[in-house]
């Protein structure tokens, strides 16, 4: 697996949206962030060469959930995700830690865990027809942009 294949797979899951944030991290959300979607996986697009020998180097971090978290940490190449371990995220050092089917199972489980935690209001928005959902997201982004502009003044 690699970042491109992971992205292609994740975008086939229901309601998945991706954004690039934090200088070179591809973030996957269940539902658009503008309507309250929640993040479930983060893929490092660029590996800083200074991190090559760093023990905290990672290619992906994702939500493992409290049941699977400790089990995954026993596997070589997996460690608590920096800044997100308290919410049961794990980080993986390289793509060869799992086979393709295992990656798909792990990330599908992360998606399902996150979807289950979405508030009812967000789930209702995700159940709307695509065109209506798109309008809602555009309206919400306008509101958020106006709030940000007012705050900047």
Explain the meaning of each model-derived region.
Residues 1-153:
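Charge-dense, helix-prone N-terminal extensions
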